[in-house]
């Protein structure tokens, strides 16, 4: 790239990693230097969006020292909230301070997430994983399958219910429009959510960023170079090199329809029992060869069909979100959350602020329930016929 641009980027990166904003007074042992180990506190998205830029710079220039630092940042930051579902609190501070501030400002002690923070963490995890700094593909898979897609508003009936039970807003014709508002916003992504329900409220940054994050995860599902198809995520994806038909989370089955690959390297999630995995090429069982978590399939021809099967694993897990003072019981199939409890009807907060600086008083009828996923408890994947688009790289 351009030498002067690289020099400027290096200066910005050095400035952004000065001791000032880094270092945390959060709870925990203080024998480790918080600055040197990339500890931080404050507004999650405000901080993480800068780290996205640092990660882009570090992976582009192979700044190894900065990459190690960002690895520490990510592994520290993923401890807040519930990474297994992609829930990250909007603000990270010492617990007592956070609870006190939330109670004073919002009338409750919980801490909602922000979609942009989830996007930042996914983006950082993607860049670090693809650079070989860490293996965070299971984190990415969990974020995508859970809170990322759950942030999208698709239920017209529920949105109408929320509108009918919400305080009336002052309409300003020069900036507000009341024409088909719900219909025009189906598919938009809400800005804020608790672990079990969303606020039907959003700002445009979260809306745009979450759409972009879905594309980035889709794009990273498979990479291709010199005859090798690298499958990173077991998600449905059509590509010029291989089509992926994923039956997850209904059943442990993935079908890879080869177009150009001579060999494939397929990352198998941590929850899969590798000893129980089976692989067939054109219906013929082939020997299992591993490279870490990567299943190696070789000597492929265009038109070959690779079928990978394994037992679907269902787990019950406990995850504590301390600002809510709640331990959630989470039922997973693989990395997909299919149920969660408790599901309180009331919001943790009594009011929420908006971009105009005003507050909206909340009531239990204004919640948009998440994880209405009884259909995912079935053991056979539904199918439908669609026209698929192939992205040209």
Give residue ranges: language-model regions.
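Long, well-ordered core segments of solenoidal/helical folds
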Residues: 7-28, 69-86, 142-153
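Surface-exposed beta-strand/loop patches in extracellular or lumenal glycoproteins
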Residues: 257-270
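Carbohydrate-binding/catalytic loop surfaces
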Residues: 26-50, 86-114, 156-204
């Amino acid at each position: 790239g351009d030498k002067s641009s690289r020099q400027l980027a290096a200066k910005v990166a050095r400035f952004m990693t000065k001791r000032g904003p880094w270092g945390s007074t959060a709870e925990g042992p203080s024998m480790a230097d918080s600055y040197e180990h990339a500890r931080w506190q404050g507004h999650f998205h405000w901080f993480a969006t800068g780290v996205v830029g640092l990660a882009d710079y570090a992976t582009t220039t192979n700044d190894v020292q900065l990459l190690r630092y960002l690895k520490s940042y990510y592994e520290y930051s993923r401890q807040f909230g519930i990474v297994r579902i992609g829930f990250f609190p909007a603000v990270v501070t010492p617990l007592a301070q956070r609870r006190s501030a939330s109670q004073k400002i919002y009338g409750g002690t919980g801490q909602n997430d922000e979609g942009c923070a989830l996007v930042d963490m996914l983006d950082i995890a993607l860049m670090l994983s693809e650079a070989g700094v860490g293996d965070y593909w299971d984190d990415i898979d969990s974020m995508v399958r859970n809170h990322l897609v759950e942030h999208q508003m698709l239920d017209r009936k529920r949105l109408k219910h929320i509108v009918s039970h919400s305080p009336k807003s002052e309409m300003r014709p020069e900036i507000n429009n009341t024409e088909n508002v719900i219909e025009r916003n189906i598919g938009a992504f809400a800005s804020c959510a608790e672990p079990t329900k969303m606020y039907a409220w959003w700002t445009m940054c979260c809306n745009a960023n979450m759409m972009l994050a879905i594309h980035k995860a889709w794009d990273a599902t498979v990479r291709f170079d010199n005859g090798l198809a690298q499958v990173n995520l077991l998600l449905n994806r059509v590509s010029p090199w291989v089509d992926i038909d994923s039956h997850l989370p209904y059943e442990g089955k993935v079908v890879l329809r080869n177009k150009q690959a001579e060999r494939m390297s397929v990352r198998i999630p941590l929850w899969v029992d590798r000893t129980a995995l089976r692989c067939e090429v054109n219906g013929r069982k082939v020997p299992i060869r591993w490279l870490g978590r990567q299943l190696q399939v070789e000597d492929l021809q265009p038109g070959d069909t690779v079928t990978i099967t394994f037992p679907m694993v269902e787990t019950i897990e406990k995850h504590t979100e301390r600002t809510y003072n709640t331990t959630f019981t989470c039922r997973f199939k693989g990395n997909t959350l299919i149920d969660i409890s408790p599901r309180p009807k009331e919001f943790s907060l009594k009011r929420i602020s908006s971009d105009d600086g005003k507050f909206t008083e909340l009531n239990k009828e204004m919640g948009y329930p998440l994880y209405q996923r009884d259909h995912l408890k079935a053991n056979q994947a539904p199918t439908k016929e669609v026209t698929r688009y192939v992205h040209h790289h």
